[in-house]
């Protein structure tokens, strides 16, 4: 009930601000990715692993111990609640498969690519259910494409394309610039962006408040 109340407040704030596209404020999530990543089969949530974050610091992460599969729709109720509480266009976000593969300790798969592709299959199932539930836009959050561009080129784009395979609704992908990380020397542009022309994604969301950021691709 408290999360529902907080979500309604977030919706009304966005409406009063005049936003055309409304989100639920993600009040129900402990993080942008773990809400989905820890709800999957093949993940040991009781004994987490360790992986390096975007700034190189070790963090507790989901530990993959078996085949990654979606057990049930994770965010469908979020969409249904959002749809019932606004008449504006609505957007929901899901953690991207490449990013989830980078935020996991892989104790099962022979390669990170195989892990990312199974995450992608689970995300694909989720996206289909989110559109059925009333989402107008589904966005995949892929901050690690900017943080680890070589791996993103090697198999991240393949995983993203698998996640979007056969999807007909409006989709977006968000790539962070890394504002949350304590990095003293910041790059002036994105390390992974033109590559998204090889994806069926219809919209690219980037961060552009960074001083001196060159938005050219």
Enumerate the language-model features and the residues they cover:
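Domain-level signal for soluble alpha/beta catalytic cores
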Residues: 1-217
């Amino acid at each position: 009930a408290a999360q529902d109340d907080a979500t309604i407040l977030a919706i009304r704030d966005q409406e009063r601000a005049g936003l055309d596209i409304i989100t639920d404020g993600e009040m129900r999530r402990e993080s942008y990715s773990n809400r989905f990543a820890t709800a999957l089969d093949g993940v040991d949530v009781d004994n987490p692993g360790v992986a390096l974050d975007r700034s190189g610091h070790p963090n507790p992460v989901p530990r993959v111990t078996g085949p990654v599969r979606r057990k049930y729709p994770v965010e469908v109720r979020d969409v249904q609640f959002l749809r019932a509480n606004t008449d504006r266009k609505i957007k929901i976000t899901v953690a991207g498969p490449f990013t989830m593969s980078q935020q996991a300790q892989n104790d099962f798969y022979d390669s990170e690519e195989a892990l990312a592709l199974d995450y992608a299959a689970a995300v694909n199932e989720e996206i289909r259910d989110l559109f059925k539930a009333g989402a107008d836009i589904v966005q995949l959050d892929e901050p690690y494409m900017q943080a680890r561009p070589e791996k993103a080129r090697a198999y991240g784009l393949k995983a993203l394309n698998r996640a979007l395979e056969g999807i007909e609704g409006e989709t977006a992908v968000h790539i962070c610039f890394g504002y949350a990380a304590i990095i003293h020397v910041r790059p002036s542009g994105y390390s992974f962006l033109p590559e998204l022309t090889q994806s069926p994604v219809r919209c690219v969301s980037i961060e552009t408040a960074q001083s001196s950021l060159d938005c050219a691709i």
